[in-house]
Swiss-Prot record:
Function summary: Involved in biotic and abiotic stress response, but not in systemic acquired resistance (SAR). Acts as a negative regulator of HIR1-mediated cell death responses. Acts as a positive regulator of cell death induction by PR10 by promoting its phosphorylation and its ribonuclease activity.
Subunit structure, interactors included: Interacts (via LRR domain) with HIR1. Interacts with PR10.
Superkingdom of the source species: Eukaryota
Residue ranges of LRR repeats: 86-110, 111-134, 136-158, 161-188
Name of the molecule in the record: Leucine-rich repeat protein 1
Alphabetized Pfam families for the sequence: LRR_8, LRRNT_2
Tissue expression as described in the entry: Expressed in phloem tissues of leaves, stems and green fruits during pathogen infection.
BP GO annotations: defense response to fungus
Annotated organism of origin: Capsicum annuum
Length: 197
């Protein structure tokens, strides 16, 4: 019986270690695609067992990444698709940088995400319809970028789930309109979009 318990414990620890390593690998891929003149990512050492000791990273008691806070860190580069493996991430805050390129579709995997802070960067392309998968999301800040096209219906439908409280898409190159009224009855939702002439 002790042998079975020991095998189970070793197996559970191995699963946790693999998850932490994949999260560290994902964050390291992000780091490798960033210019970091202020060394905000200097503590991000991929040789460590997990990223929970890195600055700007917060983990839960299972040593899984729940928060990445890099607002105003003077970073430039692209958001990497590997961020989509941070399955327990609740806060992705990379606002007020010079991050460019497209918003990765792989962020759809972050189903525990509460806050997506991508504002005041240089992101371009369209808002991925896959962000409509983020049904736990409460705050989505995409304002002050170079995003174009229409807001996908799947993203607008996040209002229907009653969790999304703020979606700021102002100061972009978006087309189309969004409904002004909240028809859910569950949440006070603010959608901020540039006024069209």
């Amino acid at each position: 019986m002790r042998f079975i318990a020991l095998v189970f414990l070793v197996g559970a620890l191995a699963i946790i270690a693999v998850e932490c390593n994949s999260e560290g690998d994902a964050l390291n891929a992000f780091k490798m695609n960033m210019l970091d003149p202020n060394n905000a990512l200097q503590s991000w050492d991929p040789t460590l067992v997990n990223p929970c000791t890195w600055l700007h990273v917060t983990c839960n008691i299972q040593n899984s990444v729940t928060r990445v806070d890099l607002g105003g860190a003077n970073l430039s580069g692209i958001l990497t698709p590997q961020l989509g493996v941070l399955y327990n991430l609740q806060y992705l805050q990379v606002e007020n940088n010079s991050i460019s390129g497209a918003i990765p579709r792989e962020l759809r995997n972050l189903t525990n995400l509460l806050s997506l802070g991508l504002e005041n960067n240089k992101l371009s392309g369209t808002i991925p319809s896959s962000l409509g998968n983020l049904k736990s999301l409460r705050w989505m800040r995409l304002n002050s970028n170079r995003l174009s096209g229409e807001i996908p219906i799947s993203v607008l439908k996040l209002v229907l789930w009653g969790n999304l409280q703020l979606m700021n898409v102002s100061d972009n190159k978006l087309a189309g309109t969004v409904p002004l009224a909240n028809k859910t009855g569950f949440a006070i939702t603010t959608i901020v979009q540039d006024m069209k002439a």
